[in-house]
């Protein structure tokens, strides 16, 4: 019977309960865990949640602002392209108008220069014609004297006195 009593003693020392059934330590640890969980839920989670919500709101607002800015940029770019196209058309019209006016001025100056040149040419022709007639008249009047002088030199006789007496008759 000695063997049986050692077996019973060994069974009593090794713990007599089922390990699946909780004992008092488990309930104490569970109570501490629930208290810590309550403290975290009451004082730690709300500020973190608030910061996360503010951050999410800020990100949402930033995305919305970026979308609005992109829309405004696209609208401004479209407007600027329209304004630039209008300005280019106006500049092209002004250039064409200036070219037309330049051509008119150039043709006007050419016609003035041509008229002035024609007037100067006519004036010069008239002056040359008058000078030619005057020179011809001078030569006509001096031809008689020159021919008498030349004849007297060639013949050696003074013809100017003979010519004067023959004209006087």
Curated annotation (Swiss-Prot):
Q: Spell out where the chain crosses the membrane.
A: 26-46
Q: Which Pfam families match?
A: ATP-synt_B (PF00430)
Location in or out of the cell? Cell membrane
Highest taxon above the source species: Bacteria
InterPro entries, per this entry? ATP_synth_B-like_membr_sf, ATP_synth_b/b'su_bac/chlpt, ATP_synth_F0_bsu_bac, ATP_synthase_B_chain
Note the HAMAP family from the entry.
ATP_synth_b_bprime
Explain the purpose of this protein. Answer: F(1)F(0) ATP synthase produces ATP from ADP in the presence of a proton or sodium gradient. F-type ATPases consist of two structural domains, F(1) containing the extramembraneous catalytic core and F(0) containing the membrane proton channel, linked together by a central stalk and a peripheral stalk. During catalysis, ATP synthesis in the catalytic domain of F(1) is coupled via a rotary mechanism of the central stalk subunits to proton translocation. Component of the F(0) channel, it forms part of the peripheral stalk, linking F(1) to F(0).
Q: Which family does it belong to?
A: Belongs to the ATPase B chain family.
Protein name as annotated: ATP synthase subunit b
Q: Which organism is it from?
A: Mycobacterium sp. (strain KMS)
Q: What is the lineage of its organism?
A: Bacteria, Bacillati, Actinomycetota, Actinomycetes, Mycobacteriales
